[in-house]
Amino acid sequence: VAEMRAILKQGTSVQVEHVPVPEPAAGEVLIRVAVAGVCRSDVNAALGLVPCADPLVLGHEFSGVIAGLAPDVRGFAVEDRVTVMPLIPCMNCERCAEGDTESCPYHECLGFQRPGAFAEFVTVPARVVHRMPGTLTFREGAYAEPVCSSLGVLKADIKPPDRGLVHGADRTARLAERVLRSYGFTSLDVRGTGTGEDRAGRIPPDTYDFVVASEPRAEVLDEMIRVVRPGGRVIVRGRPLEPVPLDLATALRKEVTLESVSYGTFAASLAFLCQERGHVSDLLGSVRPLEDFEDVFSAESESQRLKSFFCPDFAGIGTDEIEAWARLMGPGA
């Protein structure tokens, strides 16, 4: 049986292990992983802070090249450059029936319920695979999932010229700001714990038509309720690890709408990346071998300023060299 290297979580242990190369089942494709992004939720899974399968190959944000297909798969070919929506929809619920599969509440996720992408190969249903535009690098393709998540804010009932606040000091807040600006929201502030603006003083109450809370902690949500205008919206992104208490009395008094959002569409994510490439490049960090996972996970826990990536096939070489190799892997490069 052919084997591959993968970051495998078993119980409380996380190690790079040799595991069997998966074979695509009916309706699936086998993808050779070129680049896989590291998210805080991957670290939480590694630490056992979120429910997930055991044993489990971690990782859910990635791009790569199709290496094999089940006989019934149509529309793809070996060597196609692809990226993947890691949420596997149930295809049985009302959302799925409406075609809004990115919002399926009963999904499974790569790297949590199904084997993930911190590996040389991964199998996924063909219905969540998206061919990458030839202009995108594999690192940008692996960033499609975070962009898709940020696009979820547009599901909220907001529109230009509404005045908004994005709360947060990390890359997810900066990405959400850029997504909103690209859709015409020009009256927009960004402010987060630890920033100079935050230390300079409190925002006056009732300042914004809407606020986006990327860190759903109690103190953050209470502050967002305070600074949004009566009748305004608090848009909640991110997934807290524990239940969050809320100042519901103030929210009721001000008739504030609390709106939780998840994902936009993956097609819109790829379109955004093609159009706004220069506006995300400063959010993308280094590419590392799988064997560096302890350092990468530690850095992600301490700071979420830049997105780090794994390249399963390489160790100890620079990002540019990895990109040069990766772009040769597909005919659309």
Short names for language-model regions:
Residues 238-256, 268:
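Rossmann-fold NAD(P)-binding glycine/threonine-rich loop
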Residues 39, 51, 85-130:
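Cysteine-cluster motifs in flexible loop/terminal segments that predominantly coordinate metals
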Residues 27, 201-211:
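A short acidic, Gly/Pro-enriched loop at the edge of an enzyme's catalytic core
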Residues 136-202:
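Mid-domain Rossmann-like dinucleotide-binding core that forms the NAD(H)/NADP(H) cofactor-binding site
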Residues 2, 267-333:
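C-terminal hydrophobic helical "lid"/dimerization subdomain
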